[in-house]
Swiss-Prot record:
Pathway: Amine and polyamine metabolism; carnitine metabolism. SUPFAM superfamilies: ClpP/crotonase (SSF52096). It is an enzyme of class 4 (lyase). GO terms for biological process: carnitine metabolic process; fatty acid beta-oxidation. One of its GO terms (molecular function) is L-carnitine CoA-transferase activity. This is Carnitinyl-CoA dehydratase. It catalyses: (R)-carnitinyl-CoA = crotonobetainyl-CoA + H2O. Catalyzes the reversible dehydration of L-carnitinyl-CoA to crotonobetainyl-CoA. Belongs to the enoyl-CoA hydratase/isomerase family. The active site is at E111, E131. It holds the Pfam family ECH_1.
């Protein structure tokens, strides 16, 4: 793929390692490449889960490459399919992504992690959105996704002052799923990925579709919406072979064999 991205396939799990010394910062070229990777992951029927991490133990990603910015790359440059870092604007990805945050996740690096479905982080990780101190705003999802997780006062402090949040605080606020040691990070992310593989792929796709389309609706309206037949995956999963296989495997005391149909 490129010198900046290392891809490893472990069965149905794709591991993506961002490797751009010194801080795994992302320029437009790298963002384009990441977008291609995530779109290929989306469209590959053999892949079920992706894990994104950074090389080394200090930086997950420092976000936008300020060296590229100093050389003329604009904040509103074309960062390719999927938006900045290839994931922040893919809104039809019905497979789970795990961010294995191995260190600092700043600016667009934090926004990349927020675009994932799960965040597992090392105990030395920290998170920040310092864009206001650089004369820009975290418009690749930070100022949009973070308010859905945190109270307004905490969001304001993070986006307006650039305050850093450590791993344990992020866990308390529900930003991350797990905090583990650096040595355990990838094994823990892989364990979570395998748990996701053990769930039915159509059910996962339907869940993501429902979350995505009903998150701003009142509950009563959401019920009507998901039962209206307009969704792609939800009606399919109800009449799928997997919906038969799950209860059958349970009754026969064996692991289900999912077909994704």
């Amino acid at each position: 793929m490129s010198e900046s991205l290392h891809l490893t396939r472990n069965g149905s799990i794709l591991e993506i390692t961002l490797d751009r010394p010194k801080a795994n910062a992302i320029d437009a070229k790298t963002s384009f490449e990441m977008g291609e990777v995530f779109l290929n992951f989306r469209d590959d029927p053999q892949l079920r889960v992706a894990i994104i991490t950074g090389a080394g133990e200090k930086f997950f990603s420092a976000g936008w490459d300020l060296k590229a910015a100093a050389e003329g790359e604009a904040p509103d440059a074309d960062f390719g399919p999927g938006g900045f870092a290839g994931l922040t604007e893919i809104f039809n990805l019905d497979k789970p992504v795990i961010a294995a945050v191995n260190g600092y996740a700043f600016g667009g690096g934090f926004e990349l992690a927020l675009a994932a479905d799960f965040i597992v982080c090392a105990d030395n990780a920290s998170f920040a959105l310092p864009e206001a101190k650089l004369g820009i705003v975290p418009d690749s999802g930070g100022v949009l996704r973070l308010p859905k997780i945190l109270p307004p006062a905490i969001v304001n402090e993070m986006v307006m002052t650039g305050r850093r949040m450590g791993a344990e605080e992020a866990l308390r606020w529900g930003i991350v799923n797990r905090v583990v040691s650096q040595a355990e990070l990838m094994d823990n992310a892989r364990e979570l990925a395998q748990q996701l593989v053990n769930s039915a792929p159509l059910a996962i796709a339907a869940l993501k579709e429902i979350y995505r389309t009903t998150s701003e609706m009142p509950v009563e309206e959401s019920y009507s919406y998901i039962r209206s037949g307009v969704l792609k995956h939800y009606p399919s999963v109800l009449h799928s072979e997997d919906a038969i296989e799950g209860p059958l495997a349970f009754a026969e005391k064996r692991d289900p064999v999912w077909k994704g149909r």
